[in-house]
């Protein structure tokens, strides 16, 4: 069974760094918006039946920019089996607008709170259990740059995608 997992989030939140770590790719990473303007595809290092899609960084699913059109069309048109929503742990509030839009799509979501190494270094704490309960999705602490938590995020996404694939289609039952 093949599984498609999309990486979605704001610009500069670590999507491509996570993509490179999960796939063994070497996509260019830059510290400014607009580096990734098209979707990139790679096979998950741990399971070749899993395809990871690196989507351009966007602030909203409203298609105003080319990046937003590419990301929105993929999420709505091709409907991946799961989404890893990467958010910048050093600026959660800015990221949650897109997160709520993504969750409204009805596609299983794992939220990966990235840059946790920086959050902890600054002495801040993010209550991921509380965030998970409030949002209604799995929340995992990661550092894409250091590689911590990334396999947990990927495996949770694979798990929820597999459960979705095994569930009967409600429309076909009626």
PLM feature spans:
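Helical mechanochemical/support elements of P-loop NTPase systems and associated helical scaffolds
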Residues: 33-37, 51, 67-70, 79, ...
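Conserved G1/Walker A P-loop phosphate-binding module
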Residues: 1-64, 77-78, 82
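Conserved nucleotide-binding/hydrolysis micro-motifs of P-loop NTPases
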Residues: 25, 34, 57-58, 89-93, ...
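Alpha-helical scaffold segments in soluble metabolic enzymes
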Residues: 17, 21, 70, 152, ...
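Signal for well-folded cores of large energy- and translation-related assemblies
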Residues: 23, 60, 75-76, 103, ...
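Canonical P-loop GTPase G-domain recognition
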Residues: 117-169
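Conserved small/polar residues in nucleotide/adenosyl-binding loops
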Residues: 173-174
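Conserved C-terminal guanine-recognition region of P-loop GTPase G domains, centered on the G4
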Residues: 42-47, 70-140
């Amino acid at each position: 069974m093949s599984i498609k997992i999309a990486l979605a989030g704001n610009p500069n939140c670590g999507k491509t760094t996570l993509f490179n770590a999960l796939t063994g790719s070497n996509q260019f990473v830059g510290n400014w918006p607009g580096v990734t303007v098209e979707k990139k595809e790679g096979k998950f290092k741990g399971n070749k039946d899993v395809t990871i899609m690196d989507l351009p960084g966007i602030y909203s699913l409203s298609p105003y920019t080319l990046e937003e059109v590419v990301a929105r069309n993929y999420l709505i048109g091709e409907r991946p089996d799961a989404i890893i929503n990467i958010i910048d742990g050093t600026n959660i509030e800015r990221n949650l607008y897109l997160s709520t839009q993504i969750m409204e799509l009805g596609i299983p979501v794992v939220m990966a709170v990235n840059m946790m190494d920086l959050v902890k270094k600054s002495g801040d704490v993010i209550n991921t259990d509380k965030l998970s309960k409030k949002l209604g999705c799995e929340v995992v602490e990661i550092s894409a740059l250091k590689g911590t938590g990334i396999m947990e995020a990927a495996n949770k996404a694979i798990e929820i995608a597999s459960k979705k694939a095994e569930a009967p289609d409600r429309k076909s039952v009626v």
